[in-house]
Amino acid sequence: MICTHDTSIYYAARLAGTSLIHRLDRDAHFRPFFDLRIRDGVMRASHASWDCVDMSGRFTDAWILLRQMMDWPVTEEESGVREYLLAGQSTEDGLFYDCGVRIADCGLGEHPSPQPSPSRGEGVDRADMFCQSRALLGLTSWFLESGDIEIEERIEMLADGLWEIAAKKDDFCYYLGHRYSPDGWTGVSAYTAKEMGPTALPAYGVLQILPLTRYWEATRSPAAERLILGLLNFLVRESGIIREDGGFNGHLHSWGILPSTVGVLRYAMATGRDELIPWCRRVYDFIVSRSSSFGWVPDGIGVDDGITTGETCCITDLIHLGVKLAECGHDECLDFVEVMARNQLPESQIRDTSRFEFESPEVETMTLGAYDSWVMPNGLTGCSELGLEGCCTASAVRAAYLAWKHAISHSSGEVRVNLMLSRRSEWLDTASYQPFEGRFDIVVRKPVRIAVRIPKWIAKPSVTMDGQPISPRVAGGWLRIEDARPGSRIELRFPIPERRTEEEIGGRTYRLSWRGITLMKIEPPGEIYPIFQRNLESMAELNAVPLDTLKTHPSVEW
């Protein structure tokens, strides 16, 4: 039997971070490539307007969060992307513009005005409301890591600029379109969109409340809070997007619905708005009920005649929502969080480039470690005309960070082991041996009370401390140990049942083979890049990050 603790989630995150390093145009001041797409049978890299703000914000965030988990230096590439991101902010209105300001007209460290640059050939500058949230994501993590006053000032300037262009009515606000320029808006007003249905994207800019709330938690910024409250009140009370039962029709991530819900929950938790927590829980339950048993999450629900692919960004948002709901006492949400972290999240990554032909060796290095944006339940690149969008690779790093960060928590002298993942902390270290064997080890660092969440699929485990059997108290799904001493080793043992099931997803029936909650095989396999064709030997090879190289606690909290 293979005996190894599982650190594959960190291997995948490190590989993704390296992929992002390669996914930059060094002839264009480290501009990211948004697209890795199969055209005429060949994987090619290409630019899109999403490079400018969305990708540079997400890449910045991803590398910072990767650095929380493991040793990861600030590279030349990260510094270049940061400069590229900052260069997109207007000094006049504080907004981040997608086009015309950076490639030919400025070098690194220069901060141009938002005038169109004909040399870019991409049309007029636009400040996309979705992309403002991704700039905020990167800037907020940057500020939390560094405390840099300049970054704080830039976030304040952006919050002021967004408030200035927002339409206000009573105690809520909204945007008059999807993309703004000094010459006017394009797209549909969010207030009008609520009467037109979900395809008009009434939540497109509302997801700004997630990074704004995290920034507000750290600073209590009045500029951030007024915008948060205005957008939150629009989403929850005025937009009509979310039904009473938590259901909705729309794309989860790209239409802003799911990340906006995470923002609502974070603000509710920070301000004692407890009445909003059940609202967020209903959204979570609705999405989980439309997802697969192994953590495949649909890109959209109730649109486009049924979505049969999933986007990695949706998994990240749902993990975030699940771990924060657990902090509110909804511990049962962690079961599906762990399912996603063990299954669909790692399997959505390209780790075998031999399956593709590439435009160049450089494109191959970009592809290794990239995450898919059109994931079929049984294979990647489910929409061959589209492909591996840069947002998903950066989001996958964020998902790994969220699982790592929330796997262990501490409150009132008690350490809670929320997820059965391998992790180090200042209080104790954990080592998970799934799916190789039913074993979970805890090495105590400090004298603390310990509570271990026991997932529903595990019957009461046998427990030893320093080799001696003990009978800890088990209640409400938690196993509690009161008398652990520094240096003690606690071992939980339990059977890993093997089973086979059938499941219909998107109108197609799949046959599934499991070890515990780890999906080993799915049939029929996908065509272009089959996934879930696992065996224990190949999975052991992914445990290439030694546990003792992981960090014990983050300086950046999400």
Model-derived regions, located:
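Structural helix-adjacent loops and short alpha-helical linkers that scaffold large soluble proteins
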Residues: 1-10, 66-82, 142-159, 215-229, ...
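Catalytic-core region of carbohydrate-active enzymes that cleave or remodel glycosidic bonds
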Residues: 269-289, 305-353
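Carbohydrate-binding/catalytic loop surfaces
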Residues: 29-50, 96-111, 123-131, 174-207, ...
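C-terminal beta-rich recognition modules with glycine/proline-rich loops and embedded aromatic residues
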Residues: 17, 280, 334-438, 474, ...
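Well-ordered alpha-helical segments within folded domains of soluble proteins
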Residues: 49-68, 78, 126-144, 197-217, ...
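Surface-exposed beta-strand/loop patches in extracellular or lumenal glycoproteins
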Residues: 443-456
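Low-complexity, Ser/Thr/Pro/Gly-enriched N-terminal "stalk/linker" regions
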Residues: 1-58, 65, 69-102, 107-109, ...
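Solvent-exposed beta-strand/loop surfaces of large extracellular or lumenal domains
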Residues: 458-483, 500-505
